[in-house]
């Protein structure tokens, strides 16, 4: 985002090498430096390139998680890391990897740079913060969903929303097969309803293509929300009836009106 005298960067790519190339591309467009970085959430593929901007950045903004990390989580990190390695196919060749899910392979997985983190200098705990940063109006909104520290950014003058990873063009990881902390699906659905309540004309997700036009945003994000809500409600119903895991898997189906959308998303999964 271009301000009066500087650039405001929303997330930083996933490695120092890729962020350095981004920095070069930005320099061809403007001589304004990146002075502000805003993290949509704490996943490393959104923060890993931050160090490439250490020579100019003055403020790094993030939100604190709405729920504390469960105590003792660090004790299961060895198996979590191993499962993460398997989930994202870090040990596979490009030919062996069928899909990365959300886009191209992460830089550190293929030797294209390493994680280069910088800590936030501004950490908000509020539900919503309005800021004018170098002449650009922002509303930063806490938006629990894929993560408990997730936010979306609303640019009211441009009617643009950056939604982080609470929407992307594939089926979301409602619960990760690598076994991370529980993701609050009911709250995620509420967050998507909140996203839809803003009069955005462009929606920029953290992964996959942007949605342009109010009608497309309402249709695509609305279907995304309704699909999640349907799976969630059906799963709770199965649990209430005492069905086994296998029986639940066989029972849960997307409604007919959402199946075509589901076919577009079923081969991919979020992070």
Language-model segments: what does each one mean?
Residues 12, 172-177, 215-217:
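Short acidic, glycine/proline-rich loop/turn micro-motifs
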Residues 123-125, 129-155, 160:
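Core dinuclear metal-dependent hydrolase active-site scaffold
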Residues 17, 27-126:
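Active-site HxH/HxHxD metal-binding segment of metal-dependent hydrolases
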Residues 147-181:
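Mobile, glycine- and charge-enriched loop segments
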Residues 10-12, 35-43, 61-64, 143-144, ...:
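Active-site neighborhood of phospho(di)ester-bond hydrolases with catalytic His/Asp-centered motifs
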Residues 160, 170, 182-247, 251-255, ...:
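Divalent-metal (often Zn2+) His-rich catalytic cores of metallo-beta-lactamase-fold enzymes
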